[in-house]
Structure formats: structure tokens, C-alpha cells
Amino acid sequence: MYQKDNASLQIDLVFKCNDFSNLSDPFLYQPGNLIFESSFWEEVLLCWINIILSEKNTSFPNFIFDKKIFSLSLQIINNNEISSINQKWMDKSGPTDVLSFPMISDEDTTKNLNFIELGDLFISLEMAFQQSLEFDHSIKKEMLWLASHGFLHLLGWEHNDDNELDNMLNFQEYLISKLD
């Protein structure tokens, strides 16, 4: 996994994963599967933060580059829960794969702080599983894909046209490739 000599960076992750032990596919939810562990996501997110901060990518707000502590929540939930959130906050019906709710507003609110509250990230495990079958890759890869997409949104990256979306998707691939 990508390592940068920057031990002073920290991730403050509030992690929640529903109990999916009753799912019909035994390969999806297995105790010990890293995608269900907070420590796995802390390591992944810290790796991605290190990469982003070391590369000074211009797609992100400048004020994130002097922060040392990054706080966010990640919840792995089911289709019913993500449908409810999608309806309430996005005014869209039905489940979606990932929702992100960024907290970043502007430099003035964070300039004297060494931490930044990024926001909340919700991933539907059921949608991730369906998409992993559709795209013929592992559930872990799909979860990393969805997490990277939502995480980039938490950092302020938007895709308002096809070019911006292509750039974002390419950067997601890059981030995931650095985990190997």
C-alpha cells in the first residue's frame, strides 16, 4: 500500500456497518471480510489522503492541504436505508449505490484549525454486490470504487460534464491502484 512519510496525518473515522449475516449469498458477508472492518477503511482513507496531499491535485480546495486530521463518517447500509436517505435529502426515489454529504464550505471556517470535517458517506452493500456481479469483479473492488467516488465528493470534487466525470473516474482508478 502507498506510504508517504507523514506520520502526523490522522483519520478520525466514525464507522458503522449493518449486520448483513442474514443475506442469502454466503460469499458476501463473511466474518473477517475486511470491507466490514473499521481498521480497513481507516487504512484505505489515510492512504488516499496521503496521495492527494502529496500530489496537490488542483481538483481539491486549497485549504485541505494544510490539514493534519481528517474526520468523516462511513456507513455501510442496506437498500431500504439508502432509499430513505436518497428520498429525504436528494429528493430521488429508490436505492442508489453511494451517497456523500460534504461538509467542506470554505477556507474561512477551517483556516485556524488543524482538522477538517469532511462529511458523511453512505454505501449500499446490496447495490455494491449487484454491481460487482454486473461488472464481474469482487465486492471488495466495488466497495473501494464506491468509497473512492464518495470520498472525492467529500473533498469537493464535482463532475458537471463528461470531461470532469472522466477525470474523476480516472483518479479513482489511480487511488485504488495505489492500494496494491
UniProtKB/Swiss-Prot annotation:
Disulfide bonds: none
Cofactor binding, per record: Binds 1 zinc ion.
Enzyme class: hydrolase
One GO term describing the cellular component: cytoplasm
Binding, Zn(2+): H149, H153, H159
Species the sequence originates in: Prochlorococcus marinus (strain MIT 9515)
Xref: PROSITE patterns: UPF0054
GO biological process terms on file: rRNA processing
MF (Gene Ontology): metalloendopeptidase activity; RNA endonuclease activity; zinc ion binding
Cofactor(s), names only, from the UniProt record: Zn(2+)
Lineage of source species: Bacteria, Bacillati, Cyanobacteriota, Cyanophyceae, Synechococcales
Residue ranges of the TM segments: none
Function: Single strand-specific metallo-endoribonuclease involved in late-stage 70S ribosome quality control and in maturation of the 3' terminus of the 16S rRNA.
Cited Pfam families: YbeY
Localization per record: Cytoplasm
UniProt keywords, alphabetically: Cytoplasm, Endonuclease, Hydrolase, Metal-binding, Nuclease, Ribosome biogenesis, rRNA processing, Zinc
Name used for this protein in its record: Endoribonuclease YbeY
Family to which the UniProt record says this protein belongs: Belongs to the endoribonuclease YbeY family.
EC number: 3.1.-.-
